[in-house]
Amino acid sequence: MQSQVRQNFNSDCEAAINRMVNLEMYASYVYLSMSYYFDRDDVALHHVAKFFKEQSHEEREHAEKFLKYQNKRGGRVVLQDIKKPERDEWSNTLEAMQAALQLEKTVNQALLDLHKLASDKVDPQLCDFLESEYLEEQVKAMKELGDYITNLKRLGVPQNGMGEYLFDKHTLGESS
């Protein structure tokens, strides 16, 4: 059955939004896996675990925002299987933060591709939604991760386990 509220909403944009939902849920899943790795008793970096858990919640909220938008525009939600994270273990916080930055860049590129598609299909509402809800936040997230990576390297991680502890306690512990 066709939606009665659908207007100027291209089916390519609708399909791309469903793919974005899947990517955001995958990102949430990766961050959740990271969180519980750093919460293990033999890793015990609780502020790092908390940071990644918050990232997981944020990514899930992004997916839900896309789901709500899809319905608002008269599109149809088509959920897909969420891929398992490629790893379950991390050598250190630096390695995990670098992987998180790469993940955020992947999400950012997908958002930019969706914005281009919306622009090509002359969908100013979708462009506005992406600009107001996602694009600036992605830039901030990438900057934050970049700063964390710089500070972890400055503290001598991965060679210096004390640096990892200090980062957990003082950098992430301060934001708690």
Swiss-Prot record:
It is found in: Cytoplasm. Its main location: cytoplasm. CDD domains: Euk_Ferritin. SUPFAM superfamilies: Ferritin-like. Gene3D superfamilies: 1.20.1260.10. Its EC number is 1.16.3.1. It catalyses: 4 Fe(2+) + O2 + 4 H(+) = 4 Fe(3+) + 2 H2O. GO terms for molecular function: ferric iron binding; ferrous iron binding; ferroxidase activity. It is an enzyme of class 1 (oxidoreductase). InterPro entries: Ferritin, Ferritin-like, Ferritin-like_diiron, Ferritin-like_SF, Ferritin_CS, Ferritin_DPS_dom. One of its GO terms (cellular component) is cytoplasm. Residues 7-156 form the Ferritin-like diiron domain. Fe cation 2 binds at residues 59, 104, 138. Keywords: Cytoplasm, Iron, Iron storage, Metal-binding, Oxidoreductase. Transmembrane segments: none annotated. Stores iron in a soluble, non-toxic, readily available form. Important for iron homeostasis. Has ferroxidase activity. Iron is taken up in the ferrous form and deposited as ferric hydroxides after oxidation. Oligomer of 24 subunits. There are two types of subunits: L (light) chain and H (heavy) chain. The functional molecule is roughly spherical and contains a central cavity into which the insoluble mineral iron core is deposited. There are three types of ferritin subunits in amphibia: L, M and H chains. M and H chains are fast mineralizing; the L chain is very slow mineralizing. Belongs to the ferritin family. This is Ferritin heavy chain B. It comes from Xenopus laevis.
